[in-house]
Amino acid sequence: MGFLKLIEIENFKSYKGRQIIGPFQRFTAIIGPNGSGKSNLMDAISFVLGEKTSNLRVKTLRDLIHGAPVGKPAANRAFVSMVYSEEGAEDRTFARVIVGGSSEYKINNKVVQLHEYSEELEKLGILIKARNFLVFQGAVESIAMKNPKERTALFEEISRSGELAQEYDKRKKEMVKAEEDTQFNYHRKKNIAAERKEAKQEKEEADRYQRLKDEVVRAQVQLQLFKLYHNEVEIEKLNKELASKNKEIEKDKKRMDKVEDELKEKKKELGKMMREQQQIEKEIKEKDSELNQKRPQYIKAKENTSHKIKKLEAAKKSLQNAQKHYKKRKGDMDELEKEMLSVEKARQEFEERMEEESQSQGRDLTLEENQVKKYHRLKEEASKRAATLAQELEKFNRDQKADQDRLDLEERKKVETEAKIKQKLREIEENQKRIEKLEEYITTSKQSLEEQKKLEGELTEEVEMAKRRIDEINKELNQVMEQLGDARIDRQESSRQQRKAEIMESIKRLYPGSVYGRLIDLCQPTQKKYQIAVTKVLGKNMDAIIVDSEKTGRDCIQYIKEQRGEPETFLPLDYLEVKPTDEKLRELKGAKLVIDVIRYEPPHIKKALQYACGNALVCDNVEDARRIAFGGHQRHKTVALDGTLFQKSGVISGGASDLKAKARRWDEKAVDKLKEKKERLTEELKEQMKAKRKEAELRQVQSQAHGLQMRLKYSQSDLEQTKTRHLALNLQEKSKLESELANFGPRINDIKRIIQSREREMKDLKEKMNQVEDEVFEEFCREIGVRNIREFEEEKVKRQNEIAKKRLEFENQKTRLGIQLDFEKNQLKEDQDKVHMWEQTVKKDENEIEKLKKEEQRHMKIIDETMAQLQDLKNQHLAKKSEVNDKNHEMEEIRKKLGGANKEMTHLQKEVTAIETKLEQKRSDRHNLLQACKMQDIKLPLSKGTMDDISQEEGSSQGEESVSGSQRTSSIYAREALIEIDYGDLCEDLKDAQAEEEIKQEMNTLQQKLNEQQSVLQRIAAPNMKAMEKLESVRDKFQETSDEFEAARKRAKKAKQAFEQIKKERFDRFNACFESVATNIDEIYKALSRNSSAQAFLGPENPEEPYLDGINYNCVAPGKRFRPMDNLSGGEKTVAALALLFAIHSYKPAPFFVLDEIDAALDNTNIGKVANYIKEQSTCNFQAIVISLKEEFYTKAESLIGVYPEQGDCVISKVLTFDLTKYPDANPNPNEQ
């Protein structure tokens, strides 16, 4: 889809110099203060697209140059160019330049003519004349205020049908004038033809006078010969026909006997089939009951399987978690055992090393005995000297040991607390996993419960509805049976009525939708008291068949003739001419229009009912009917409730007893409907009983739902207990332990500080004691070769202390690891027990599922087998039902054949009697003709016999029944039969006449001709001798007039063809636009209103030629009732007008749409809706360029073009562009408005 990319303006209106505006996005808003030149930008777009100067708010093209309106033009030329971009094609430039006082058009910088320019724009969908690309300021309000005629003018402009209006009017005038000329010449020709005829008659009178004299005698002979000839032909024909009919009667008797035997055989076969059908129905009922019992068992088995599968999945998940924990704990224990072995190995290596070192170092500092004694003496002396210091140091040592014990205790407690915290964390993790499992199970259970509840609700509703409906059906059936009992439904239809009903059904099938039915079947008096009156008024039209068109009626008549049906009356709706109902008659007191007391369906048969009823009135009694019929200044057709009819002509008719019999047909029609209703209710009762049998399935579902609800309740209780008790308690204990652990650090640090401080004091005391020892052992140390006595003592003591300390570290590590190993072993055993337990559970569940699946499959197999058997029975039932129907049809056909044969037999017997009567009549006619010829002395040409053989006695009439009279007549007829007449003088054409109507017509013609000849002969006077000259003159004049008439007729035909052509073109243009707009406007109005309940309608006042009259436009605002356009609020009118604007734009849409302040009359809500609609449409249907002053509107755009003024001799417009796509909309969803 193409779009407007850039606009380049130079010295156009308020835009001084050259300015490039753009790029334009799919939805661009032009904003700026009043008077800044926004509308001038729209004028620039209109200008470059070829808009007329008058629509650009200036008088001349020069006034469009910047500064020209104030007398200071910025230049002698100005131009506007547009860059149009299309995907997959090069950009095209369209430019319009003002040079002097005219425009110059360019495409891609090449100068072209205006028509070429327009054609290129039209290829893009831009129609200059229709202005389908822009909406000027105030146009929305203008459209909202338009009346229907003005709306038509708008459509004329958009569709360009208005371009043809002048030519349309011109050709219409030419057509009317040509038709008037033709009519004038026709009347002139007619008058001259009458003159010619008169002159011709005068001439012929003279010729005819003599000719008639000769022809009168010949005509008399011809007439009598004609009568006698055809009398003899008819007698011969009747004799042959009589013999043929007697043969047909014999054949018919034999055929009837054969058909009756066949009918008896078919009845036996039908009885057998119906018994078989009833047996199948019984088996179907039993299988259906069996299926209803088996289905809940299958549902229960399936539910058990599903529940057990869910439990298995949960158990498998728990097994995986337990195995995971077991594997992790096993790994931790393996690590601890490895660490224990490593510590033990390190301890052994240390002991071995110490043993080796003690052996190598033990011999270095060995003292002699005297040196040992001296060492002990000096040691005792040093102790005495430092006794005070030793006591003080001993006290420090005791305190230090006590604090060291405290420190060890705190550190041990810290380690234990850390172990307890780890244990609590594991317990918390276990609690959380249990909660997750419970929540998952509860969610699954809730879903299952919802499904069960939903199924329970559906089944409950279905069963309850079935129960209610069964009660209703039983009540209705009781009522129907009572009504049928009252109506004595055992009435038997005559074969004639059956035949008519069959033909009616046949033509309905042949012409579905075109044949509606008989009038009596399509209407019903509103009350029973009106039945006789309505029957009287409808009369013979009661049985008339209503069809949609004359063609359908003729086709039906042809079909009925082919089927040899009785004559029928047809009322074609397109052919009937009906006078409108006189509304004043509804105001008469004591009377109602007959059409008002009749219900009818479907509605479009009203025309036929109006035709049958007219403006007839129905009154309660005869006096009121007579008063209203004849009492006023104007007569009316009225009927009383007893059937007395008063016609306008003054004729009064009654016939109450016959009318009552006819009126009973309304009740018979009701009985037929009651029978149909009874059959329909019986079938529905069977279906509802099937639905009621689902109660067992409902109870099963309710039981399953209750069990699921109880399990859900226990799970929720367990979840709540786990959350509130176990998890909360563990979290509380963990928090308490963490708090205790946090307190260990400060206490340990305090003890360590005390120990360190005491160590410093002890160090000072030791140094003092060392000084005393150094003084006492000074000489001894030199003797044994050490710096001081402590070096000697520490070699042994220090080593022993280090070894003891190292051994203690090893013991502590082993103790710690042993405790952890014992704990991990206990936990590992618990995890192993859990794994074993879950493995057993999974195995057990899998075995149970296998059993349940087999049980489910067993039930399913039983159901499938039962359903297959049921379907087989149903198929057998359908087949048997089809056979019964076929057999019934065969019997019906045989009955029809029997009825037809019977009817044909009766018909043949009637025909034989009629032929014998006709034969007797023809013989009597021949006797009378011969007798008349003899009496009138008309000489007949005879080939055998003479005129004397004709008897003078009159033939006996049909009323004579005596034997002697009949014998005498037969004797006369036999004697006259011997007379043979020579028909050689009779014209062959007269002999060839076959049909009775044709013979009668020829006879009348001959008689009339004879009468005329005799009459003319008596009246004719001396002929006019100048008649020939007058005839020649009139003939020349007639030829001249005929030529003029023919020329005028051809001119009229040509003018009408020209008019019809322009009329069709104008209608096609207008209708194409109107249909497109009318189709799209409702959808657009809904989209603008953001409400699917909104409705918009367009309708022409004149559908044949819509451009000659107005177009109605109505809208139903969301949440409101239908109101005329004038009663809508201002905002609603504006939205409606916008809907019409966008719908018009959808007809041959331009790629972009320029709109000037269409939101002026909208409130914030409607502004949002319109803006969102434009935003939606701009993404796919068209580019929107909108001038707006309202923030609620232009914030929805993809880009803004800001226009601001600079003051000078006149306003100078400047332009800024702003891309809004970089700033996402705070409300991106337009549907939220």
Swiss-Prot record:
GO BP: any one term: cell division
Binding site for ATP: G32, P33, N34, G35, S36, G37, K38, S39
GO cellular component terms, A-Z: cohesin complex; cytosol; kinetochore; meiotic cohesin complex; mitotic cohesin complex; mitotic spindle pole; nuclear matrix; nucleoplasm
Region (Disordered): 284-308, 348-369, 947-969
Keyword Ribonucleoprotein listed: no
Compartments where located: Nucleus; Chromosome; Chromosome, Centromere
Tissue: Ubiquitous (at protein level).
Protein family membership: Belongs to the SMC family. SMC1 subfamily.
Protein name: Structural maintenance of chromosomes protein 1A
Organism: Mus musculus
Species lineage: Eukaryota, Metazoa, Chordata, Craniata, Vertebrata
Name of the encoding gene: Smc1a
